[in-house]
Amino acid sequence: KLGLFMSRQVGYLDERWSWPGLLSSESKFLSVLQPIEVRGVSPKKQYAFFPFSAISRNRVDHETRYRVGTDFFWRPSSNLQLSGTVNPDFGSVESDDVVINLSATETFFPEKRLFFVEGQEVFVASPRADTRGSGVGNRGAPYTMVNTRRIGGKPRSLSLAADENITDRELDLPVDLMGAVKVTGQTGRLRYGLFSAFEEDVDIRGTKAGTPVKFTQTGSDYGVARLIYEDSKAGAYRAFGILSTAVLHESGDALVTGLDGHYLTSDGKIQLDAQVMTSDIDGQSRGYGGFIDGEFAIKKGVVQRVGIEYFDRDLDINDLGFLERNDSFRIRSSHIRTSSGLGWAKSNQFDLRGYVQENNDGLFTGAAVFLSDSLTLNNLSNVLLRVGFFPKAFDDLNSFGNGTYRTALRRDVAIRFSSPNTNKWSFGSGIGWREEMLGGRHISVGGGLTWRPNDRFSFRLRYFWADRDGWLIHQEARNMTTFKAQQWVPSLNMDYFFSAKQQLKATLQWVGIKAAEDEFWEIPSSPGALVKVAKPAGPSDSFGKSQMTFQLRYRWEIAPLSDLFIVYIRGADKGLGLQDNSFSDIFQAGWEDPTADTFIVKLRYRFGS
């Protein structure tokens, strides 16, 4: 028995047509698909091997590297699948967006490596772990025990002697993998998944007393196990699952276990999801936390969500997972109204959400109210409005462990207009205003232009400019500085399909910052307002920053599921003392001193059933 769903994007109308006709706001999906029964089918065992060979030339380190490996896939039945990779190479994967983050909270980057993306659904233990969100409201960072971007990520930090040094570039280079294997399947009402990955040892270049040396660090081993029981008696969906992860390293092991439960009423109007988890970091600290979320479909197009979460200060899932912060108790809520066929407009989505939060010491560490409204006019133009409000609170993170301080009441507002994206030429433009942590102002302007003359070619230009007065950044110990800063963020993206089998893609993203020191502050010894002080002794805190990614990527499908990749990558992450630098000076400084300047050729060919 199968459930059938067909969908087609109608470009000139900017609509998606489907059968059965299911709206994006529907609370049920799989259970309402068109049922089809197919008889006399004998599923065939499937297997495939994808051997590859790659050569890369690193023009920064003047090294040429050869790499040979294979991906493999075996499906002995429709209920079991085994996949793996040996000596993988991910050099041809599309680059991440460029982000300069000087705060204490980590930026989440979605997974783009195909091996880790495929078959990942069983390891998604709650809606909070699903990064494929939609809608006008800002869902925030995910809460997930399995963030595969940790695998083959940056090396672990090293303890160095006073005369030893390692550049930031070396600590940002990815770690190679020896291999990985993944098993997913189902038996009756049980779904399961097993996953393991193994990093190679890594040599990190550095200096000791000015002499070049190599520091060797062993790689980490990763393991994930997932089991979930699902039942849909009387039309209501119930599920209970366990998810366990392990990261093993000579410096210490990190073990995390979570239990999750899910419930959906037969009419799809009430959905409950919950997860509790515990972490054990090398037997030295054990933490606990969890959350419960409720979603209520009040009527067609109207949804109310409520969530409660608690994480103690010892919970740490970030060796393999992603959690923006621990030491937190938070209540959050959202109310979403989606309307269509308004007569004077095609559709509208209204989103009102907010949260209140305190840490385990009882300090009020944050709250916010966000209002978003996306209006699509009958000519397919779109107007987007966002308004935010943040009351006074304590910041216990951005001192990087040096104390807790007060932040001011803040407001922000932004509006954006986008022309119909069904035309050959389309554009968008917006303006925003918000207040800084201590009350300064932040003004931004952004927009873009897209040219799509036919189905084979597209060109996109995006820009963002910001002027900040009062940007608060931690410096060292208990010292903080506010800056007058300007930020310039242009990006270019070009796609050209020579044919259905050949594609050329070029992307350029750059972030440039000019920040001049303004006022100087000291974090109090007990939670309270920052204390304004004279400039501490030492060099100027003013700085410039250039971060860039340029990628030129050619792909030729020489046979089904077999590809030739030719890729050029150039990246920069350059900090410099701010003098009379222009943005062109800052861009040139990063371009001429790249962290990556690599040419890659990779051939991958499929053999199998």
Give the ranges of each region predicted by the language model:
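Outer-membrane beta-barrel channel domains
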Residues: 1-30, 34-40, 45, 49-55, ...
